[in-house]
Amino acid sequence: IGGGVATYLLQFAKAAGAMVYVTSRSQEKLAKALQYGAEKGLLHDEDWVEAMGGGKVDVVIESVGAATFDKSLDAVRRGGTIVTFGSSTGDLVTFDLRKFFYGQYTLKGSTMGSFEEYEAMIRFVEEHDLHPVVDAVYPAEQFKEAFQRLESAEQTGKIALQIG
């Protein structure tokens, strides 16, 4: 957890009634995620299944890519789903295909969705009064500093540019 999409996904999942576990490289970001409602925060380099007490999850939202895909597959229950929308650590992953089909997993790629899905999302946001977490707002002239903060991956939430 850390970026704007991940923090918003945490809010969406909580509003939908899900029990939410998040992962991060940063203890500080995990602490913030707990403040936003996550049940548990897992460090990226620990055994996620062990950290969850041996349990597995119904759905994994995978936004990192190659560096965490295998751990995501290990953490999802038999018949569960992995939804992927990002690949910041690499586009190519390899995984045990036999384990995948014996596990009866579903793998779903996602981008922006359809117009109908967008409308449903807007209704959900309004109904649950969701607001994105904003880490920092920079004047447009400081766009380089804003991108440096984004590149550093130190933010928790959105980085915004103020225009005008």
Q: Which residues fall in each region the model found?
A:
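A general structural signal for well-ordered alpha-helical segments in protein cores
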Residues: 30, 57, 69, 97, ...
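Conserved helix-to-beta-strand junction in the class I
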Residues: 74-76
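C-terminal hydrophobic helical "lid"/dimerization subdomain
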Residues: 115-164
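Residues in the short beta-alpha loop(s) of Rossmann-like NAD(P)-binding domains
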Residues: 26, 88, 113
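Adenosine-nucleotide cofactor-binding segment
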Residues: 1, 14-71
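Hydrophobic/small residue at the entry helix of a nucleotide-binding pocket
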Residues: 4-5
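Rossmann-fold NAD(P)-dependent oxidoreductase module
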Residues: 8-12
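Rossmann-fold dehydrogenase core element
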Residues: 78-83, 94-134
